[in-house]
A protein has these predicted regions:
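Beta-sandwich/jelly-roll carbohydrate-recognition scaffolds of carbohydrate-active enzymes
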Residues: 1-162
Length: 162
């Protein structure tokens, strides 16, 4: 039988929503897509313009960094620029253990602990254990934002913290 490792925590979990429309990149109207990989420095950048159904345009840039010396450390920076509108953009970012197993099509993790703190020094942490082999993984992140309002770090569905 083929061997398939359970998906671990998704530490890049990000959802972006404008006026009730959530970005689903595989279905969205996207233009000016650019992706660059800098292997020497461990940096992946991706940017594009999301053309919303109501005519609004939002430029989105992701910068993902993996430490070249401390392999368990990674970071993601998301930059949002409203190109033709003023208004609110909702972004959810966090840690998610709800990815299904590739062959069994079910989640193979049980959440053991979730830690979070809202506000200026927001923090999220999640610990999961595989259902069959009891392997444990803990993932944590600091959440920083340069915006007017930043709150509501919370637990969602006992499978993720966003």
């Amino acid at each position: 039988t083929p061997f398939c490792i359970s998906n671990s925590v998704d530490w890049l979990y990000t959802r972006i929503c404008v006026d009730g429309e959530e970005l689903e990149i595989s279905k969205a109207d996207i233009s000016e897509f650019v992706r660059e990989l800098d292997m020497q420095n461990g940096v992946l950048t991706r940017s594009f313009i999301w053309n919303l159904s109501n005519g609004k345009k939002l430029k989105i840039s992701f910068e993902r960094i993996l430490s070249m010396t401390d392999v368990q450390v990674g970071a993601q920076k998301v930059k949002l620029t409203a190109l033709n509108f003023d208004g609110d953009v909702e972004i959810k970012s966090g840690l998610d253990f709800s990815n299904p197993h590739c062959m069994q099509k079910m989640n193979m993790w049980e959440i053991k602990d979730i830690l979070y703190k809202s506000g200026k020094n927001a923090f999220a942490g999640i610990e999961g254990e595989t259902l069959h082999t009891q392997q444990r993984v803990f993932s944590a992140c600091a959440i920083k934002a340069d915006v007017n309002e930043f709150d509501n770090v919370k637990e969602e569905d006992r499978k993720s913290v966003v």
